[in-house]
Amino acid sequence: MGGFVLAIDQGTTSSRAIVFDGAMRIVGTGQKEFPQIFPQSGWVEHDPDAIWDSVVSSIHDALARARITAGDLAAIGITNQRETVVVWDKDTGKPIHNAIVWQDRRTSAFCETLKRDGLEATVTTKTGLLLDPYFSGTKLSWLLDHVEGARARAEQGGLCFGTVDTYLIWRLTGGKSFVTDATNASRTLIFNIAEHGWDEELLALLNIPAAMLPEVKDCAADFGVTDKAVFGAAVPILGVAGDQQAATIGQACFAPGMVKSTYGTGCFALLNTGADRVVSKSRLLTTIAYRMDGKTTYALEGSIFIAGAAVQWLRDGLKVIGDAAETGRLAAEADPGQPVYLVPAFTGLGAPWWDPDARGALFGLTRNTGPAELARAALEAVCYQTRDLLDAMHKDWQNGEDDMVLRVDGGMAASDWTMQRLADLLDAPVDRPSVIETTALGAAFLAASRVGLWPGMDAFARAWARDHRFEPVMDAETRTEKLRGWRDAVRRTLTAG
């Protein structure tokens, strides 16, 4: 057995591969971006072959930088963008359509029809989710209805459905493994999180044939072995989790009441609720945090669709910055007397508002508003939305401790200005870990602990290390005024008024 573990982190805009050694140190990385496809307003797609090519390229780069070969790997862990739908031919492996991405809103009208028919309560009771285009089920139904012959082929067992993890495992194993894990399954809108299986009633509701669904496993399990012809060596795939659940694991949020927030393209906060499957009264999601040895740990999740993507918009859309790294410096230079609010509802608003038809808006603009004020507004929007999520979580689940500490990760967590403003607006400490690649770390832990290369959960939690703690310094009056302005801006953006 080799002494290294490979984490594949397949994201929304790029794929990453990270090699860890037996001491949990990063020894090699690779990253490859791939194109985003926008066929219509509100539609977002990926070419599955482009996803695959980016994964292969990043793996080759990571192994080369680690100065090892595939044969030196003890195991592979996979983490991935969730909810994104891929459908492919079981015999040829060829996708029948581009992947429909989690950000895609094309099924908004279908979701509204189902809501009007009074079906959301049934969906939420079974899945912990809401009837929103965000999740996989309505996307899959759309594909079956709009790709010629797809439904008949699916009913005959000729098509495979998967989230991105399933598609990658299929290709890595040369088509031998058709599997997913409980966390990815829990995001599909057709998986019953209480009974731990695909739900016949929901499949009938969305007219999805059960024959096209993968087997669901624990997060740490035997997912298959890579095909030597594809990968260069036969390496076991032993860990899989959706990206936000993998980050929860990588942050060692194993105790009920612990909460983490990941800042990438979107922002996602998860609160560990242990064995307690909390029914949210604040339109948060009840989801599976992880499933180990057949035991399910649940979480409350709040999903923000636009976080780092707002900074990309400043760079690529408005062209007011040249590089994302400039944003924090610019924000620090903003005029404190000019309160500008950005509500980044570019693809609707997520939790706790769930308004798919809301669109982005800027408030408070004057003739003196410039790039600095826009940069501050973009970064503060992420902080305000996080505050909304955590307020809703604590309203739903009273078992958490009053002295909450938020563990953060993702690209935006590297910004000292943003993390300080986050602590200020939360009125709570924010901890940034020493290993910022927590999503990949979580996937690596699942695989490495199963193969015996790394320790178990207790020892892993003790090894978690903090890089920096940001303590709140903003006075209560300023914080209250800023939050009031934000909530007024959101209210004016919502389509319901």
Curated annotation (Swiss-Prot):
Annotated binding of glycerol, by residue: R82, E83, Y134, D243, Q244
Domain of life: Bacteria
GO cellular component terms, A-Z: cytosol
Keywords noted in UniProt: ATP-binding, Glycerol metabolism, Kinase, Nucleotide-binding, Transferase
SUPFAM superfamilies tied to this protein: Actin-like ATPase domain
Involved pathway(s): Polyol metabolism; glycerol degradation via glycerol kinase pathway; sn-glycerol 3-phosphate from glycerol: step 1/1
GO terms for biological process, alphabetical: glycerol catabolic process; glycerol metabolic process; glycerol-3-phosphate metabolic process
Binding site for ADP: T12, R16, T265, G308, G411
UniProt note on regulation of activity: Inhibited by fructose 1,6-bisphosphate (FBP).
Keyword ATP-binding among record annotations: yes
Residues that hold sn-glycerol 3-phosphate according to the record: T12, R82, E83, Y134, D243
Binding site for ATP: T12, T13, S14, T265, G308, Q312, G411
Pfam family, one: FGGY_N
GO molecular function: ATP binding; glycerol kinase activity
EC number(s) on file: 2.7.1.30
Catalytic activity from the UniProt record: glycerol + ATP = sn-glycerol 3-phosphate + ADP + H(+)
Functional summary from the UniProt entry: Key enzyme in the regulation of glycerol uptake and metabolism. Catalyzes the phosphorylation of glycerol to yield sn-glycerol 3-phosphate.
Family statement drawn from the similarity comment of this UniProt entry: Belongs to the FGGY kinase family.
Protein name: Glycerol kinase
Organism: Allorhizobium ampelinum (strain ATCC BAA-846 / DSM 112012 / S4)
